[in-house]
């Protein structure tokens, strides 16, 4: 399973390589409409998060009839093995504000790659016009934010 940390990952790691859908549980966690209780820590509003493969999710309703244990074929296991985490994520507000960010992010990702649509992107990947390259951790660090004392990365307004 691939973990999507931002909208660019959805394009490059999934849709460009042939996926027609993506799982975005962690990305949508923290929205008003997602399950979980709110809490405050160090002045930040957070929302509890249980990844589907976490022990908390597997134990929540017992192992029988539980989507989490079913997904990981653990319904009859007496010992559960975590394949996810529980924690807290920063409050993202309503999904009504977050979905336009995702939509625009998909458009910008396609434009950055030089394609006007997902269909064209997939065609260009298959034909070799768009190719992927491996970047070392050093290259990724070098390509990041440089020469700033501090910065803030906001997903959307």
Curated annotation (Swiss-Prot):
InterPro entries: Aldolase_TIM, IMP_DH, IMP_DH_GMPRt. This is Putative inosine-5'-monophosphate dehydrogenase-like protein YAR075W. GO terms for molecular function: IMP dehydrogenase activity. It comes from Saccharomyces cerevisiae (strain ATCC 204508 / S288c) (Baker's yeast). GO terms for biological process: purine nucleotide biosynthetic process. Belongs to the IMPDH/GMPR family. SMART domains: IMPDH. SUPFAM superfamilies: Inosine monophosphate dehydrogenase (IMPDH).
């Amino acid at each position: 399973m691939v973990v999507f940390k931002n909208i660019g990952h959805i394009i490059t790691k999934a849709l460009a390589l042939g996926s027609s859908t993506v799982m975005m549980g962690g990305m949508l966690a923290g929205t008003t409409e997602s399950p979980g209780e709110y809490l405050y820590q160090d002045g930040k509003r957070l929302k509890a998060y249980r990844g589907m493969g976490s022990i908390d999710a597997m134990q929540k309703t017992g192992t029988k009839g539980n989507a989490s244990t079913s997904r990981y074929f653990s319904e009859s296991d007496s010992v559960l093995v975590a394949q996810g985490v529980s924690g807290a994520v920063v409050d993202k507000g309503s999904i009504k504000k977050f979905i336009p960010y995702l939509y625009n992010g998909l458009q910008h990702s396609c434009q950055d790659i030089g394609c006007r649509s997902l269909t064209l992107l997939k065609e260009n990947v298959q034909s070799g016009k768009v190719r992927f390259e491996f970047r070392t951790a050093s290259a990724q660090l070098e390509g990041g934010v440089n020469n700033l004392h501090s910065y803030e990365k906001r997903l959307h307004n």
